[in-house]
Amino acid sequence: MRDEPPAAPEWSVAAAVEGREISFPNGFVGCTDWKRFMLQSPPEHAPIRVLQSLDNPELALFVLDPFLLSPDYAIDMPEAERRLVQLDKAEDAVLLVLLVIRRDPLLVTANLVGPVVINSRSGLGCQLVLEDTDYSVRHLVYSEHPGQGDKEDAA
């Protein structure tokens, strides 16, 4: 059983947006009022990062590089969202997934169906909702069988 978090890469493109204000013009699914965030990497939580709301200091979203969970993770970003975040080159994209933190660390899940995309150049971001996917909204982060989550929750 994996009882340690996935190892963090030595460098990530996410470092390019860390500490900068990131604007989410449409907010997040279920959380559209807060649009300004800052990505932080508290060392005690590595490789988990925090998207801290600048509009509501009580709101912090825990995020993780999806490739730590699923090395072959792939998404198709619709053109409307590419325009929204002014993303012209794939290499400028920072891809993260939201985590649901639970009291029992073995029950922490990642939403692979609703990834967050940030343009490292423009500082604009959006949350996607993937359709027709086998990914889960409750992908177990710590699991005996990596890659398994609650498949019935997949969109």
What name fits each language-model region?
Residues 72-77:
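Extended catalytic/binding region for NAD+/ADP-ribose chemistry, centered on the ART fold
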Residues 2-70, 90-155:
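Long, compositionally biased stretches
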Residues 79-89:
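Short active-site loop/helix that positions an aromatic residue
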